[in-house]
Every structure is written in C-alpha cells, then in structure tokens.
C-alpha cells in the first residue's frame, strides 16, 4: 500500500511541481516502507516518484517500494546532490516541503543547495492523510482487534498488589504476541490517585482494592495505529466513582452522536464537554475530546474547542473525554471512530460497561 499517486494528483492544484518528503511518517505514507528516523527521503512529482536511502535500506526498499525509482545516497552522493539531479531532470521550479516537520538546520541546508523554490506543504499532506482509504482502515481495525484481545487477556491479572508497570508490560507483551508490529505509544497505566494524571507514567505503585485503573494503549499493524482507553475498578466502587464513570461515558456517547462529516471538531468536543459541565465536573476535563489517528498516533484534524473546520468523511478520530479529580481519581474512556456522511462508525468493540474486578 502506498500513496504516491494520491499525492501526485493534487500537486498541480496547489501550484507545485513536486513535494519533498523527509519525515518518517510522510515517507511511510507515500511509499509504504519504513526506514528509521532521517534515513530516507522521497520526491513525488506530477508524473514520477523517487525514493532515496542509504546502503542499509537499499535492498529492502527495492523489494518493498512500488512505483518509485530507488536512488542510493552515500558520501560521494549526498541527498542534496541526488535531489538536484531529479530537480534538473523533472524541471522542478516549485517544490513543497514539510514546514511543520523539517528542522531549521535542514531547511537552511536545503535552501542553500537545492536548485528550486521550497514552498510550505505540510497542510496539503495533512489534508491527504486525514481521509483514510479502505486499505488504511483495514490496518487500523486489525490493530484495534489486537489491542482488544490483549486487554481481554490481562483483565484477570488486575488485582490488589499488582503494579501499574506490570500491567503495562503485560499489555505490551500481549499486543506483540497477537501480531502487532509495535506499540502505538508508551502505554499509560495509572491507578487510584495517579488516575488524575491524564498522561501519567506507569509506576511501581501497587493497585489497591477500591481504586480505578485507567489503561490507555494501542499498537501498530501495517504501519497504522490503534488507540483505546478503558477504566476498570478493583474490588468495589464508591457512589462518587460510579457517578464520575457514568458521566464520562454519557459524555463520550454524546460526542460520538454529534460526530458527522461537515460538523466542526469544536461542535463534537462541545457536545461531550456540555455533559461533563452539566454534571458539575467541567473544570476537571482539561483536554480535548479527540485527535485523529493514522500512521502517527496524533494527526489532524482534531475534535478540539478551537477547531472550527468541518470534519471530512474518512477521518479517523479518537473519542476520549475524561474527568480527573486531583489527588483522588481519574476516569477516561476512549474509542476510535470513522467519520461518515451519515454520522460515524465506531471501530472499537470492547465493552464500556463499568467493570469491577
């Protein structure tokens, strides 16, 4: 799976002869091939595509990159020289670059050495990546199923005395065991008072009876991410715990019900936020309702209070409201939804009923 043709198809409308891809995520989106960090570059022109890498990846690139000419860089043939060869061959005068990713040092170096005008093109790439095709969705759904199987396997291990770190390690192992290529991000496992830390780091803290345990995790399949959060209780719950949990779930369902192509990200966020505010917990929901997911765990567009743009059909967005009472507890519930013309499709199947282990 690659998107060379999809990228090439929008260049003329944006007044570009080509686009230069240097960041790992955009290189993978275009080519379907992983090379780590800065070890690669690609140029997509209106008619042809080129993939540049060094000797460590040349053989693999030749095997897996379809629809692009492979060029090998080395000490005698640096990236700038190879890129200039393509610029001359393809008569490129205006080339897009990733202004939100490229470092100032790299931009300065390319600006000095490349024989064409460099034009910001991150927004163009974000717009393309926002709308997933069926092959991309299939990978994301498979990643989600793997994560759900991992969760089902480890629920029986969550009990008093087990540490947050141990639960995080089990999730990672199980996702790899069931076929994940990698984790989407470092898993978040927080319990009790640590639950009020939305992005808390799993610690040596033992889980205790009467606490919530929040697990935010995901994996990659086919280069695409999954993302989900479930909060479970251990032993028993108080009335307050149950109220907070049910409020978060009601807010999530309200946001999902509001999600539809053409609706703004702010409107989706607002539907969920209003539920939490009406329950008296407004100050304790500080982050946004959701972010897009794809090749990267955080993409665009987002369901945030500041996003006044309509969501496109085909966008894949997390739905993850939360309530965090400092020093006391936290609850977050997260699914991933696909925006459609009719509403949205929830690709997360794991139960959201309050589970008391």
What function would you assign to each model-found segment?
Residues 1-357:
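Active-site neighborhoods and metal-handling regions in enzymes and metal-associated proteins
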């Amino acid at each position: 799976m690659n998107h060379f043709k999809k990228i090439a198809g929008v260049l003329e409308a944006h007044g570009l002869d080509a686009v230069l891809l240097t960041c790992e995520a955009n290189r993978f989106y275009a080519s379907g091939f992983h090379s780590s960090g800065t070890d690669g570059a690609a140029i997509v022109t209106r008619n042809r595509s080129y993939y540049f890498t060094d000797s460590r990846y040349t053989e693999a690139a030749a095997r897996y990159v379809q629809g692009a000419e492979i060029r090998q860089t080395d000490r005698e043939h640096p990236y700038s020289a190879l890129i200039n060869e393509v610029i001359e061959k393809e008569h490129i005068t205006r080339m897009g670059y990733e202004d939100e990713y490229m470092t100032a040092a790299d931009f300065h170096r390319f600006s000095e050495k490349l024989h064409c005008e460099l034009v910001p093109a991150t927004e163009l790439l974000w717009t393309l990546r926002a709308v997933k095709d069926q092959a991309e969705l299939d990978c994301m759904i498979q990643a989600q199923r793997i994560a759900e199987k991992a969760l089902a396997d480890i629920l029986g291990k969550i009990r008093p005395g087990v540490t947050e770190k141990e639960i995080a390690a089990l999730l990672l192992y199980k996702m790899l065991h069931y076929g994940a290529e990698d984790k989407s991000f470092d898993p978040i496992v927080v319990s009790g008072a640590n639950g009020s830390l939305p992005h808390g780091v799993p610690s040596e803290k033992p889980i205790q009876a009467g606490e919530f345990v929040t697990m935010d995790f995901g994996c990659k399949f086919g280069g695409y991410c999954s993302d989900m959060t479930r909060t479970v209780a251990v032993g028993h719950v108080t009335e307050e715990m149950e109220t907070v949990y049910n409020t978060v779930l009601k807010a999530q369902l309200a946001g999902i019900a509001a999600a539809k192509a053409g609706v703004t990200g702010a409107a989706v966020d607002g539907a969920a936020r209003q539920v939490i505010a009406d329950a008296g917990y407004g100050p304790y929901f500080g982050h946004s309702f959701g972010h897009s997911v794809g090749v990267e765990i955080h993409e665009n567009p987002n369901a945030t209070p500041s996003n006044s743009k309509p969501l496109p059909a085909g966008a894949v967005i997390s739905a993850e409201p939360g309530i965090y009472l400092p020093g006391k507890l936290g609850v977050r519930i997260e699914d991933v939804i696909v925006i459609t013309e009719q509403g949205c499709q929830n690709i997360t199947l794991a139960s959201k009923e309050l589970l008391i282990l």
